[in-house]
Amino acid sequence: MSTSAALAPALLPRHIAIIMDGNNRYGKVNHLPKGHGHVAGKDALDPIVEYCVDTGIEVLTVFAFSSENWQRPPSEVTLLMQLLTSTIHEQMPRMDKYRIRLRFIGDRSPLSAELQALMADAEEKTAHFDAMTLVIAISYGGQWDIAHAAKQLAKQVQAGELCADDIDKDLLGRHVQLADAPAVDMLIRTGGEYRLSNFLLWQSAYAELFFTKTLWPEFRAAELASMVAEFAQRQRRFGKTSEQIACAQQFP
């Protein structure tokens, strides 16, 4: 049994987000052919998904391809698109076995029609599964997400359906990606870098941050379990003082 498996459900993060960094460095360190670090990274996802299902995590969101990744060499972008396609195909039996809902977030307009159709089909076929939700962020950026939400509200104002003075953070929050999912409780970045890289900026406003030097292809469920156990020990204050939190816990 993992360290976190015995934790009370109230102590578990409902939503874990992961920046899967370190694939290229893993390939270089292990002298793999160019691009094969990404292949190893694709395979590393499966045990993490299974851990989350077994532990009772509601939502797992992984950063597969950022809006900035389009700037990478065309050959690498092509490989990444191929891997995303194969990942979706390979994940479908797992989604069916564990009753996992598969969702995608991001700007789909630059993606090929074939990939867009595959994503839509996967979402439709798993829409009724409720054991967990796996979200794959493709062509996603946090700034794009917020700007996209703002544009939606601007169109409503322009159409006379909304008064500009009625726009607040709650209304904007209902228009960002994953508005219907729990806010991110725990954000993990592998690979040793200490930055958010434009990932889920709105949704992670009060997330607990975890950084590890472990490269993504070497990231294992045991390390995730240790992080979840540490998460359960942290005091999340959401702007309040520790004394206020302690008082609320004593007199719920």
Predicted segments, located by residue:
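Flexible, compositionally biased loop and terminal segments
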Residues: 1-252
